Amino acid sequence: AQLRNMQTARCNQKRLPNMGFPEALGIAADLAECAAAEIVLLAVPMQQLGGFLSALPQKNPPKYLVSCCKGIDLETGKGASALLQAQAPNAQAAVLTGPSFATDLAAGSPTALSLACADAAAGLYLQAQLSTPSLRLYRSTDVIGAELGGALKNVIAIACGVTIGAGLGDSARAALMARGYVEMQRFAASLGARDHAMESLSGLGDLSLTCMSDKSRNYRYGHALGQQKKFDPLITVEGVATAKAALALAKDQQIDLPITQVVVQLSEDKIEVAQAVDLLMSRPQKQE
């Protein structure tokens, strides 16, 4: 029904109402038809990416698979690029991530994103093919760093939403953003991201946007937690599963992720907001 509505109305009335599709954009129900394209962008929830990839036709796969997912797979502990390489080894994997909301992209608002591909030549080609007058892409070969920035900022955004929802103030949010950024750097480095990986659109850029806008689903989810309100279970909140996956990986790496830990505890109703504040504020004093 959703697909038929999109074909008739030439817009996604459920997600992006009143924003018409470009004339060149076709709408197909056949996954094999979509997979026949040279470049395929995968804009599906992170926790559904593995299942979606298993449904892709194995014969004549796309030459390029570009993940637009932001998160860590809870079942495997892998990022999007690792899932792509495991399930579609004949395709060149890339990650498109950074500070953007779908409404801004659809409206043609000026936007800049990170395009990460381990193959530098493939990244150069994709950059040329996917750039538009309103979308500027910066390429990188640090795929791990790019996808971890996009994943972990969702966790920090939940914490910031809790802070504002609970009425703890903008100063508390700023502290969480700054210390959350350090947490992102520490975790990314432990998993092989390059130095300064978070000093990017996919790291600091996406963190800034997501932690300060109520357009962010993760921020809104945290805001509801802070107000002790129920959140619509039909709305995708990538940061919840990512926080759990990151915490499991951090335990293996013996990496301290205090903000991520309280986000997991809050999302599982194991602690109240006041307890979360006490846990973070009573940590041993340290040098910055």
What are these regions (language model features)?
Residues 28-31, 43-46, 50, 59, ...:
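Electropositive phosphate-/nucleotide-binding environments in soluble metabolic enzymes
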Residues 1-19, 26-29:
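NAD(P)+-binding Rossmann beta1-loop-alpha1 motif at the extreme N-terminus of oxidoreductases
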Residues 160-161, 189-199, 203-288:
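NAD(P)-dependent Rossmann-like dehydrogenase/reductase catalytic/cofactor-binding core
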Residues 20-110, 126-128:
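Rossmann-like NAD(P)(H) cofactor-binding subdomain of soluble oxidoreductases
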Residues 70-72, 97-101, 119, 141-145, ...:
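Glycine-rich beta-alpha junction loops
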Residues 8, 36, 278, 282:
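Phosphate-coordinating loops and pocket residues in cytosolic domains that bind phosphorylated ligands
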Residues 83-93, 110-197:
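Internal alpha-helical scaffold of NAD(P)-dependent oxidoreductase catalytic cores
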